[in-house]
Each structure stands twice: as structure tokens, then as C-alpha cells.
Amino acid sequence: MGLFNRLFGKKRQEEKSTTDSIEEAAEQEVTQEKPALLAETAETAESQQSVYEKDVTESQAEQVSDARIIEDGQNSKEPAASGHSVQEHKQQPVQHQQEVFHSENSVAAVQNNTETMPSQQKKDEKPNQSPDFMAEYYARKAELAQKVESQKPAETAEQESQTTLSDQKETETAVNQSEEEASSQIAESVESEEEKYNRSLKKTRTGFGARLNAFLANFRNVDEEFFEDLEEMLILSDVGVQVASTLTEDLRYEAKLEKAKKPEALRRVIIEKLVDIYDKDGQFNEKINFQNDLTVMLFVGVNGVGKTTSIGKLAYKYKHQGKKVMLVAADTFRAGAVAQLAEWGRRVDVPVVTGPKNADPASVVYDGVERAVAADVDILMIDTAGRLQNKDNLMAELEKIGRVVKRVIPDAPHETLLTLDASTGQNALVQAKEFSKITPLTGLILTKIDGTAKGGVVLAIRQELAIPVKFIGFGEKIDDIGEFHSEDFMRGLLEGLL
């Protein structure tokens, strides 16, 4: 919403202010014209009232003059009536006073009527003038409203076009934001292999670093007790007994040369020796032996180490690289293994070759190799049994599988990969030794490295068996597997310790 407000909030406020200003102008125009009409009406009423008052005044004057003429006429008749009695002569002034009083009362009444009539006429005029004024007022108001209404369609059309344009922009912005969010989520979800190494080896690095820091914090003198404590610390870090012994002897030699007397110097020498042990002859042979046509990979290992899961993840990896992949379920004596591999095939959308229950594993493999050749498959992955407790039968089974594969492809299998669980520590080294006696191994798959602090077993395997690690599992996600790179591994294992 913040972007939306930045892009469109200001524009909508301007549109709203424009509409409000038009309505206010119309109201002001009506308000300004209303007093003018009232003033004009008032002037008309005043002029009419003045004319009326003038007429009333003239009529009053005429009435007063008539009353005086009557009075004068009566007075002129009094001398002609001189023959009346004295009593009548005495009563005449009284009658005259009464007439004068009556005349004055009549004049006052006329004046009162004169004063009353304008107000009554005003009251009478107001009903007569009010309809005309209100009619004119409403006519002007209707005219102004009509003007406003005539302007509204154009403004409404403009507002609708602007609203449509803003809605289109809003939609485009929402789409762009969703695309950006999706791309950012994808970018966040897609880690580089170096980042995966750092993440997955965090526990191993933290455990080894904590032990090394605790050891150096208790540093006293470089004596025999010091070397014994150092060897114990390395063994607890799962680097193996042979690696611990070799490193301790090398450090004794360095101490004699007085190159390792201080804690920081000791720390550097220990890490340098660990790197030298893994580097060895500089030949790692970590690359997969891919062929130009069909590459056959044979997977061996005990049950529960993540062998079938690793096959499914690698199938997903290679399929997304554009390669044609096929799987073979040769662990026919364990129904769960066949079902698990079939489920992985469904998930990653690759074909899986299976046989009947308790079928000969070699026959299922032979069928799978022939199908792979006929379908121009790039990579064929074969899942085998892991019954290490019955070494003789397992050895015979693996030898037979190798023979039937060579009938179709003489130089196959091109890779025989042993899957090891890194969390088992030194037990993984024991399994590697046992399987190397049963069948020739070309490489190792190290799984569950992210959930353990025993990643140092790689150094032990490298030191004692000279078998390269070719794949490493970083976690539970479908893409959490990759080719092993020794430099990235050692950096992830030892980074931050110096």
C-alpha cells in the first residue's frame, strides 16, 4: 500500500480537491445572488410602501379639510339662529365641543388606520411578493444547478478515465509487485552452494570452534599434557583417531622449532595442518564420471542413511538440467524401498523400473539397463539393498549386478557411490571401510550434514580411505543436494576460527 499511496494517493487528492472547488464555487454563486435578489425585492417593497403612504396621507388631508369645512358651516349657521332660547345658546358650546372631540377622534382613527394599513399591506404584500421571489430564487438556483450538472458529465467522464487509468496502473503495479515478490522469493530460496555449505556446516564449525577456543583458553605450557589434551579434543571433534594423531605429531615438531608458543600461533598451525591433511596429494577426483551417452550410477549403503532420498534429489537435479533420467528399484526384498523410489519417481516425473516382489535384483537391473539404452536415457540410477549384516550375500548380489550391467555396457557402472549419514560420526567411517571391501567405491555421498556437529568425519575418510566425497546433502529440501567441493567444505568448516 505504501507504493500505491505514493503513486496514486496524491493524484486522487487533486481530483477530489478539483471536484470540491467546483461545488464550492457553485454554492458561492448561489449565495451571492440570493442577497441581491432579496435587496432588489426589498427596494421594490419600499418604493411601493412610500407610494401607498403618500396616497394615504393625501386622503387623510382631504378628510381633515372636509371635517373643517363641515365645522365652519355649522359655525356660520349659529348667528342665523339668534332667536333660539338662552338654554340652547348655552348648550351649543357643549355640542360644539362634542363635535370637535368627535372630529378629533375621527382624525385620530383615520391616522390609526393610516398607520395600521401599511403594516397590513406589508403583510398582504409579503404573501403576494413571496411566491414571485421564491419562484425567481428557485429558477436561478435551478439554472445554476443545471450549469453544474452540465459540467459534471465532462468532469465525470474525465474522472472515470482517470480512475480507469489509475486502476490500470494499480493493476500493473500490483502485477509488477507480485512478480518482484515472486522473483525475490525465488532469489531468496535459491542459495548458492557456498551459502549452503556455510549453513549446513554451521553446527560442525560451531562445535569444533567451541572446543578449540575452550582448549586455547586453558592454555598453559606446551608440554606433553598439552599434546594429550589436544589429541583428545580433535578426536571428540570427529576428525578421527588417525587425523588427531598425525596432527599432534606435526604440532610437536612445530613446537620444537619454536613456531607454536602462543595461543594464536597454535590456532593457526592446527588449522593449517587440518587443511594439509585433506589436501594431501592435491588430487580429489570429485567430479562425476559422466559419459557422452548413458551414465550408469550404482548406489550402495545401509538402510536409513538417506540413500533412496539422495537418488530422488539427484533425479530432480539432473532433470532440471535438461537430462533424461531413469530409476531402477533393485532392492526387491524390502517392499518399502520399492514404494519409496516409485514415489520419488512420481514427484520428480521420471520413470522407475520395478520388478515383481522378491524378484532377482540382477534381473530387474538388466531390464532397466536395456530400457534406458532403448529410450536414449542420459543417466540411469540403480538403488540396491543395504544389508551390511550379511556381507557375503550382499557382496555376491553386488557382483552379479555389476556383471549384468557390463553385458549391455562394458565399462559400466561408471559410478559406485556409497551413501553415509554424517550424523553417525565415526560409525560412517566404519561403514565406508566395510563397503570398500565388498565392492570398489568411486565416491561417497555425505547426507544430513546440516543436522550434526560431526562433519569432521570427512577428514577421517579422506585420511584413511582416500575415497573422495562427490555429493553432499545440505538439508531436507528437494534441491538440498550438490556436488562436493573440498575448498568450499573446508572454508565452511574452518571459517571464522582464525
Curated annotation (Swiss-Prot):
Entry-linked SMART domains: AAA, SRP54, SRP54_N
Keyword Membrane: yes
Ranges where the record places region Disordered: 1-130, 147-200
Signal peptide: none
Membrane-related topology note: Peripheral membrane protein
Organism: Streptococcus mutans serotype c (strain ATCC 700610 / UA159)
Positions with biased composition (Low complexity): 36-46
Identification of the protein by name: Signal recognition particle receptor FtsY
Protein function: Involved in targeting and insertion of nascent membrane proteins into the cytoplasmic membrane. Acts as a receptor for the complex formed by the signal recognition particle (SRP) and the ribosome-nascent chain (RNC).
HAMAP family: FtsY
EC number: 3.6.5.4
A GO BP annotation: SRP-dependent cotranslational protein targeting to membrane
Gene Ontology cellular component terms for the protein in this record: cytoplasm; plasma membrane
PANTHER family: SIGNAL RECOGNITION PARTICLE RECEPTOR SUBUNIT ALPHA
InterPro entries tied to this protein: AAA+_ATPase, P-loop_NTPase, Signal_recog_particl_SRP54_hlx, SR_rcpt_FtsY, SRP/SRP_N, SRP54_GTPase_dom, SRP54_N_sf
Domain of life: Bacteria
UniProt note: phenotype after gene disruption: Doubling time increases for growth under nonstress conditions, unable to initiate growth at pH 5.0 and under 3.5% NaCl salt stress. Double deletions of FtsY and Ffh, or FtsY and YidC2 are barely able to grow in the absence of stress.
Subunit (UniProt): Part of the signal recognition particle protein translocation system, which is composed of SRP and FtsY.
Top-level EC class as recorded in UniProt: hydrolase
Keywords in alphabetical order: Cell membrane, Cytoplasm, GTP-binding, Hydrolase, Membrane, Nucleotide-binding, Receptor
Name of the gene encoding the protein in the UniProt record: ftsY
Species lineage: Bacteria, Bacillati, Bacillota, Bacilli, Lactobacillales
Entries under SUPFAM superfamilies matching the protein: Domain of the SRP/SRP receptor G-proteins, P-loop containing nucleoside triphosphate hydrolases
Binding site for GTP: 301-308, 383-387, 447-450
